[in-house]
Amino acid sequence: MKINSHYTDLSTHYLFHDIDLRVNEYLAHHPGEHLLRMGVGDVTRPLPPVIVEAMCSAAEELEHEDTFRGYGPENGYEWLQQCIIDHDFKPRGIEFQPDEIFIGEGAGSDLGNLSELFASDNTVAIPDPTYPAYVDANMMAGRKIVLLPCLKENNFVPERPEEKVDIIYLCFPNNPTGAVLTHEQLRLWVDYARNNHSIIIFDAAYEAYISSPDTPHSIYEIEGAKEVAVEVHSFSKSAGFTSVRCGYTVVPYDTGLQAMWMRRQCTKYNGTAYVSQRAAQATYTPEGRAAVNANVAYYMETAQMIRQGLQEAGLQVFGGINAPYIWCATPNGMGSWDFFDLLLNRCKTICTPGVGFGPSGEGYVRFSAFSHREDVLRALERIHTDLSL
């Protein structure tokens, strides 16, 4: 028996596991201390009543023989696929067939599993810093990875690689930097992919947070993108589905990958829970849209509080305008983990070290607007009074 040796190339611990180790060590020496958590990007607001009601109604259907449902379609129920098309794409002049919309358990799974469609000798371009799963999934397959630095000097927008790459990961609005692309910037990436016969995996998990008019909500707003792009969406950060688990991935026929992804899902995925899909459908009702918009507005209000509070404390910040993340430069050239430790020990506040997202994240930390509002206000007060920059 031989194991996949590429797993030995992975970091021993996942970023958030390393954070937990440091936090637990701190708490072991300071039992009972209340820490203010502004790091991990899990949501904190409860599910809107309209979504809970839809889930309860769906669960009650399963109690009765005449409405009971077993396995559903591997790629999702057509009523949800059509709902997504009608609300997320048609208003932007984008047309899809239901079979091009694949309902899944969330963006994270599909972003990792999509790599199974591609040979291991492909070259993959990934922005740096980035969501760690992009790198890990491709390291597991033994692919060559080209990192694209996202720096203050390029407004945290990666330059197109000079060499030909086969697979490109893009996430906008970006996690962790909060950066966004204009239509023109995204068009250049689509043109690159078309000219080089590449595929773009576009992570649109934070699309609901876009407010700027020149920021595209979907890569398919760009002409020709259906030929070269797969787009991944999530209900987690907009509707609070981090425990409900539901998202969707668009695999256009024109990419040549739709049949492959369908075959993969039929073999390895038995479909998303009926109750979760009814919950997702409820987000598109008028009451559901209002609830989602209220969630987004609440978190973005928190983001503005964080931006303003950090700036008043003398820190330089980016993002937090079209995304729920604030990318904060560490003071005086301090390392990411050093600043993490300083905030933990002096302000009892937890952030996310930027270097955990990649080498170009060194010298930054990430703050999350998904944090509890009370924790945010107390943390900002402590940073302002106790940090002494």
Predicted regions: what they are:
Residues I126, L147, F202, C351-P353:
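Hydrophobic residues in well-ordered beta-strands that form the structural core
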Residues D66-A193, A208-S212, P216-I222:
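Conserved core of the PLP fold type I
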Residues H30, A141, N195-N196, A313, ...:
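Helix C-cap/helix->beta junction micro-motif
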Residues D86, K90, A125, G333, ...:
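PLP-dependent enzyme catalytic core of the Aspartate aminotransferase-like
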Residues K2, H6-E105, T283-P286, L389:
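N-terminal small-domain helix-loop-helix segment of the aminotransferase-like
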Residues Q281, V296-R307, V317-A329, G361:
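Conserved glycine-rich beta-strand-loop-beta hairpin in the small C-terminal domain of fold type I
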Residues I222-M300, Q304-Q308, D386-L387:
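Conserved core segment of the aminotransferase class I/II
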